Regions:
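ABC ATPase NBD coupling module
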Residues: 22-27, 81-97, 123, 129-130, ...
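Conserved ABC transporter NBD signature motif
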Residues: 72-80
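P-loop NTP-binding/switch modules centered on Walker-like glycine-rich loops
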Residues: 51, 179, 183, 187, ...
Length: 349
């Protein structure tokens, strides 16, 4: 894994219009992604996690330009993708691929899987017919499929086999970056492990870079090098996998981790119970978007700054970043930070 970034994202925003009335006029905006910034290093796996509706899948699709950003910057290998269109974007589409969540819905039921895997080669005009068939055969072998499978249709395969087909289709163009959009969430646990191990093996052999979108923290721990935790369109915490699972800094991450079961009946994890529902992205809370449900804010008697100011994503040390007013470099406790804010006149209660 290289320290040089393959992808650099800065202040990425995506708002979807909400339309209503007879004329279908825009009556509001869904703030799906709101000011997200991060880097993806070459050869690493960056996990994107969070509850449903947090914006993690939207981020993955924005990276691939499957949907257009409202604003912000996406640099791939030093090139600003948001400035490219049509023919100028085409060479970069070859270098970025996606593995979809539903391995059946993402395959054409009327097309033999050999043709589906080789479709990218045909679209980009790569190779002759025999060369494409040989490339498809090699990709199928790489993911554990047999040559005779090429003539079969998607309904003839199990869920795990269909996901292997999706992986082969993503690999056939020899991409640098693959966005894995919850690729194992629809599979049985035993099949999940097989697919995750396959992805790890392919990354080692081919030098791939992954963005792994998931809501299962156990899966993310197994495959990721770094993890970004999202909440309502923003990154709450970003850290090395080992650091994040050893010491969570953001209250939301702490709540997520407390829900992971421990496979030992004699050990118990202290659960953090979040009150209330996730707010609507059409009308998100002001300030820190987590503040209406935040257990730390409740412990500190409701500091006003949480509702008044957006906390920046700051580095606490060792590449561990957190967006919380009461987490700062140096190891001060939230209570100490709250007292220092009161002393200098920062809004308290």
């Amino acid at each position: 894994m290289s320290d040089s970034p393959l992808v650099q994202v800065r202040d990425l925003v995506k708002h979807f219009p909400v339309r209503g009335g007879v004329l279908q006029r825009t009556v509001g905006w869904v703030q799906a992604v709101d000011g997200v910034s991060f880097d993806i290093r070459r050869g690493e796996t960056l996990g994107l996690v969070g509850e449903s509706g947090c914006g993690k899948t939207t981020v993955g699709r924005l990276l691939l330009r499957l949907i257009e950003p409202t604003s912000g910057s996406i640099k791939f290998d030093g090139v600003e993708l948001t400035q490219l269109n049509g023919a100028s974007l085409r060479p970069y589409r070859r270098r970025m691929q996606i593995i979809f969540q539903d391995p059946y819905a993402s395959l054409d039921p009327r097309t033999p899987i050999g043709d589906s895997i080789g479709e990218g080669l045909r679209i980009h005009g790569l190779g002759t017919g025999p060369e494409r068939r040989e490339k498809v055969r090699r990709m199928m072998d790489l993911v554990g499929l047999m040559p005779y499978h090429a003539r079969r249709y998607p309904h003839e395969f199990s869920g795990g086999q269909r996901q292997r087909i999706g992986i082969a289709r993503a690999l056939v163009l020899e991409p640098d970056l693959i966005v894995c959009d919850e690729p194992v969430s629809a599979l049985d646990v035993s099949i999940q492990a097989q697919v995750l191990n396959l992805l790890n093996q392919l990354q080692r052999e081919l030098g791939l870079t992954y963005v792994f979108v998931a809501h299962n923290m156990g899966v993310v721990e197994h495959i990721s090098d770094r993890v970004a935790v999202m909440y309502l369109g923003r990154i709450a915490e970003l850290a090395d996998r080992r650091d994040l699972f050893h010491q969570q800094e953001h209250p939301y991450t702490q709540a997520l981790m407390s829900a992971i079961p421990i496979p030992n009946p004699e050990l118990r994890r202290q659960r953090v119970i979040l009150k209330g529902d996730v707010p609507s992205p059409v009308n998100p809370p002001s300030g820190c978007r987590f503040h209406p449900r935040c257990q730390l804010r409740q412990q500190l008697d409701g500091p006003a700054i949480c509702a008044q100011a957006v906390p920046p994503l700051i580095e606490l040390g060792g590449g561990h970043e957190c967006a919380c007013h009461f987490r700062q470099p140096g190891g001060a406790t939230p209570e100490e930070i709250a007292r220092s804010m009161s002393a200098v006149g920062t809004p308290g209660r």
